[in-house]
Amino acid sequence: MTSLCLSFMKYLLIGLLASALLASATMFATQSRQTFSGTITDDECPSADHSGMRMGSTDTACTIACVDDHTVEFVLFDGEQTYLLSDQDKSREFAGKKVAVVGTLDSTTWTIQVNSMVAAN
C-alpha cells in the first residue's frame, strides 16, 4: 500500500471512531437516570381517579384489583403524564401510593426502566 492510501485509511478510521464516540455520548445523555414523582395507579384508571371503578375500598385495593382482574399494568401518573413501569412487582408494593421513581425514560414508549422506587415524603 502506498503512504497516501495508508494516510487516507488512518483519517477514515479516526473519523469513524470520533463519530462513534459522539453517537454514544448523545445516546447516554438522552437516556440518563431521572427522578419521577407521582402516584402508582393502573392503566385502566391512568389519572389515579378510582371513583368510577371502585373495585376496592381504597385506591390501593382498587389499583391492585384492576391489575389482577383486567389484565392491565401498573403505571406512574405524575399529574399530567402517565408512564409505563418496567418493574411491575415493585409497583405492586406501592399501588395507590405516592412514590419517587429513579430510572431511565424511553420516550418512544413512555416506559421508565426502574432502578429504584421509594415512598414519597
Positions of PLM-derived features:
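N-terminal secretory signal peptides that target proteins for export/translocation
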Residues: 1-9
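Generic secretory/membrane-interface signal
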Residues: 4, 19-20, 36
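Bacterial N-terminal signal peptides
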Residues: 11-24
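Conserved RNA-binding domains used in RNP assembly and mRNA/RNA metabolism
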Residues: 25-121
